[in-house]
């Protein structure tokens, strides 16, 4: 039975008073720590309300306007993301008030079983699972998805070709960008237009966004955290005197206002020549090689090195591909060394590559 959110007032033993302020510490959530140590993010009720306003609008307006033919309300949402991940927490807080069912899958090994038991229309996911669903589609095994049709993905960029094929086969794929430090509030891509498939979308209208002179995304508004727990130095490094939160993510914006993530500021390889190289840019080019399972680009002895995980019998094919990639690059961006690994590259619980 659905009850109004203020129904507790009917049975309250006395007059209700506010016990905390909107800007008091409400919760601590930790960053993923892919490029350094994990930090505790202090968040307030004001931060939460600013973010949930955006995601409730998404649930009520955007997704519902794209219902497949014959689909009835209310919808149901599944997440495999852990509850300590901000994207999962936002889903838990946003969708039930809109009347949606919320399905939680506790173990990715049970994904197809749980999807069969709990029909889900929409799913919040990491890139690796979207790739799995894409492979199911390619193999003609869409029926095992039990009607799942909308995929919301964050954490890392998806291959535009894969996104286009999913869209052409009836899926709605939404890339989005957000951070723990902004209570998940960020940039949302609602378009299914081919030329914008690789964008993370347009910024939330309720928050201020800008790209600084280096191309770093900066955010200002009620969603920005109180600071890092017991770490005023780290807080001062990312929140400037004017209240702008410097995300550390680099992006470009096209003439229509769509943002495209180009890399992480901390990941930039700074060569002795003074040139800056984005490893993510090179990794995207290498990922086009069918023989490469995983790769990561890093600096080693002032050289650009690619660490590649692939079958041993494909190594010569990969070397030849790297040569072709280098021919398309300026001299300072070229990959000087290739290392092969027999083990998958280390990732965190969210599937992000660890660069430490």
Residue ranges and their predicted role:
Residues 26-53:
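Conserved AMP-binding A3 loop
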Residues 115, 121-125, 133-195, 208, ...:
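Gly/Ser/Thr-rich phosphate-binding loop
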Residues 202-205, 212-238, 258, 275-277:
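Conserved ATP/PPi-binding loop(s) of AMP-dependent carboxylate-activating enzymes
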Residues 49-76, 83-148:
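Conserved AMP-binding/adenylation subdomain of ANL enzymes
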Residues 11-30, 36-37, 66-76:
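Conserved pre-ATP/AMP-binding loop-to-beta segment of ANL
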């Amino acid at each position: 039975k659905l009850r109004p959110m203020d129904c507790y007032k009917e049975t309250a033993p006395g007059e209700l008073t506010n016990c905390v302020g909107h800007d008091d510490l409400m919760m601590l959530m930790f960053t993923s720590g892919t490029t350094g140590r994990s930090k505790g993010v202090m968040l307030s009720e004001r931060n939460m309300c600013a973010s949930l306003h955006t995601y409730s609008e998404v649930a009520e307006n955007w997704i519902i306007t794209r219902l497949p033919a014959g689909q009835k309300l209310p919808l149901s949402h599944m997440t495999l993301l852990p509850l300590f991940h901000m994207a999962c927490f936002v889903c838990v807080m946003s969708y039930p008030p809109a009347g949606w069912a919320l399905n939680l899958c506790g173990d990715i090994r049970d994904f197809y079983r749980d999807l069969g038991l709990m029909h889900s229309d929409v799913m919040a996911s990491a890139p690796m699972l979207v790739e799995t669903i894409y492979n199911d589609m390619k193999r003609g095994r869409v029926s095992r998805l039990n009607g799942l049709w909308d995929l919301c993905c964050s954490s890392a960029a998806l291959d535009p070709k894969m996104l286009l094929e999913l869209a052409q086969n009836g899926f709605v794929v939404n890339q989005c960008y957000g951070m723990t430090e902004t209570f998940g509030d960020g940039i949302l891509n609602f378009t299914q237009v081919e030329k914008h498939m690789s964008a993370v979308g347009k910024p939330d209208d309720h928050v201020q966004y800008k790209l600084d002179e280096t191309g770093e995304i900066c955010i200002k508004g009620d969603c920005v955290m109180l600071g890092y727990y017991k770490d005023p130095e780290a807080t001062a490094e990312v929140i400037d005197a004017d209240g702008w939160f410097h995300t550390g993510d680099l992006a470009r914006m096209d003439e229509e206002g769509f943002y495209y993530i180009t890399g992480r500021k901390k990941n930039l390889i700074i060569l002795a020549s003074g040139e800056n190289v984005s490893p993510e840019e090179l990794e995207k080019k290498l990922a086009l090689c069918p023989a490469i399972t995983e790769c990561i680009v890093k600096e080693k002895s002032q050289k650009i090195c690619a660490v590649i995980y692939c079958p041993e019998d494909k190594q010569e094919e990969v070397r030849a591909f790297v040569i072709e990639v280098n021919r398309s690059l300026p001299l300072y961006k070229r990959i000087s060394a290739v290392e092969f690994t027999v083990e998958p590259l280390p990732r965190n619980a969210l599937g992000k590559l660890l660069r430490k």
